[in-house]
Amino acid sequence: MAENDSWDADDFEPEVSNQKGAVSGPPPAGRDRWEGEDEEEDVKDNWDDEEEAEAATKQEAQKTVEPKVSEKKKLLEKIREKEKLHKKRQEEVNQQEKEGTAPELSPEEQLAEKLRLKKLQEDSDLELAKEAFGDNVTVTGIDAMNPSSREDFTEFGKLLKEKITQYERSLFYPGFLEVLVREVCVSLEVDDLKKINNSLTVLCFEKQKQEKQQSKAKKKKKGVVPGGGLKANMKNDLEDYGGMDEGYGREYDDFM
């Protein structure tokens, strides 16, 4: 009877066996999935997370590539724009020269203007290089020098000489140097100016000696034309004789 009473009890729940193959009771509250279903869902969620991570990585890579491409395009556009402006400016100058409307400049001013335009072009190229490769562009030549010692100024002078003597064949070169030397020597003391003047005077004497030697060498190369001197002397003698004969004739006429 006791067993029957336990079966008839309202709150009776069958015992759940922990052994394999035993029938288990109803799933606990909140669990509506079969055994192993949660694991499959977790694996699926992991796959989705990996795909999303890969997609995000690709997007970031594209974002890093796109700015580089756009910067390169911008740089090319700037280069083309500067080339167009330079070409347009050159065409305007040529047109003004043809029409005669270009401003009249002295030879020194014309050479200075050419140097100024060349310097602007070099500065423009340097700025483009900085934009292309960053501020870590290595500057060489005169622009990179900041002389402070005697050796530095010697090297600086060599580079400056190479830069200026590129235009020594120009007709405006001597006048340009005259103005340049005067301008750069304005702030010097009198003693320093005397030293520079003496150096230029010595250079002038040396050039004069060279010119004299060259002129003598040219005369020696010409030589004497065969018979030329003899013919000249005979001509002079005949002229003298003719002059005497002409005087004798006049005296005879006067006597008659």
UniProtKB/Swiss-Prot annotation:
Which is one Gene Ontology cellular component term of this protein?
Answer: eukaryotic 43S preinitiation complex
TM ranges are none
| Domain of life per record | Eukaryota
Q: Where is the composition biased (Basic and acidic residues)?
A: 55-101
What Pfam families does the entry give?
eIF3_subunit
* Single GO molecular function: translation initiation factor activity
GO biological process terms, alphabetically, are:
formation of cytoplasmic translation initiation complex
Query: Which residues fall in a coiled-coil region?
Result: 70-99
Ranges of compositional bias, category Acidic residues? 1-14, 35-54
Q: Which UniProt keywords apply?
A: Coiled coil, Cytoplasm, Initiation factor, Protein biosynthesis
Location of the region described as Disordered in the Swiss-Prot/TrEMBL record: 1-109, 214-237
Enumerate the subcellular locations listed in this protein's record, separating them with semicolons. Answer: Cytoplasm
What's the stated role of this polypeptide? Component of the eukaryotic translation initiation factor 3 (eIF-3) complex, which is involved in protein synthesis of a specialized repertoire of mRNAs and, together with other initiation factors, stimulates binding of mRNA and methionyl-tRNAi to the 40S ribosome. The eIF-3 complex specifically targets and initiates translation of a subset of mRNAs involved in cell proliferation.
This protein's assembly is summarised as: Component of the eukaryotic translation initiation factor 3 (eIF-3) complex, which is composed of 13 subunits: eif3a, eif3b, eif3c, eif3d, eif3e, eif3f, eif3g, eif3h, eif3i, eif3j, eif3k, eif3l and eif3m.
Q: Which family does it belong to?
A: Belongs to the eIF-3 subunit J family.
Q: Protein name, please?
A: Eukaryotic translation initiation factor 3 subunit J
The species is: Xenopus tropicalis (Western clawed frog)
